[in-house]
Amino acid sequence: PQAQVWSSRGCPYKCIFCVWPATMTGNDPDGTQKRSVRHYKPDYMEAFLTELMAKYRYRTIYFDDDTFNLGDKHVERMCAVMRKINVPWSAMCRADTIRMELWQEMKDSGCFGVKIGFESGNQEVVDTIVNKRLDLEYARQAVAEIKRTGMTVHGTFTYGLPGETATQMFDTKRFISTLGLDTLQESGTAEIEGTPLHTLRNSRSLAKYSGAKLDDEYVPELDGRVKYDRLAALLRTTP
């Protein structure tokens, strides 16, 4: 059995589809509200995890923070905690928020795998639609370094973003083929209420949100099944 825990709350990023700000840091549909991040203190995490493992006999720990590796100091402190706890662990991470050498430190403290959200393999989509602020070439290098340490990498991608073309979706498929991921999650875009993407779908306008780019190719579909079937058919074809 695996315990799912958090070492922080909040996220400073403003991805257009993310439900986290609406549920954890206040409803922020236009992307203008400041995003705060709170890290639990190492002493608290050590006591909490020690009690958790002793009482419920979990064998592994998964840190489901929106971004576990948000800054070198937090990762270094949590690695020190996990060395004391001495159980295998994994975490939800970004590819670009710590020094490359800290991936090895995570591995040495018991981390066996990370989950990373790329969302798209097309840089324009990442920059102007998702608003993820992620350099895909740097992310590719990070995956190579993570794999070098012996940790596994689970990658997540989403299709059907507003303004995303078929060619850009196929760019994602090609990008995936270059990463050497251990496992993969591909999803259709869901416009969840409270997110900038939901506001965009309903009004076709998101003037205050600087990350999204709306164009004539974006056709909101209220019937999720229709959207899913269309995406599935498209991705089965050969670019």
Describe each region flagged by the PLM.
Residues 18, 22, 73, 162-164, ...:
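Short linear sequence elements within intrinsically disordered, low-complexity coil regions
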Residues 121-126, 130-131, 143-168, 187-193, ...:
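Conserved strand-turn element in the central/C-terminal portion of the radical SAM core barrel
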Residues 1-154, 174:
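Radical SAM [4Fe-4S] cluster-binding motif and immediate context
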Residues 1-4, 167-239:
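C-terminal accessory regions of radical SAM enzymes
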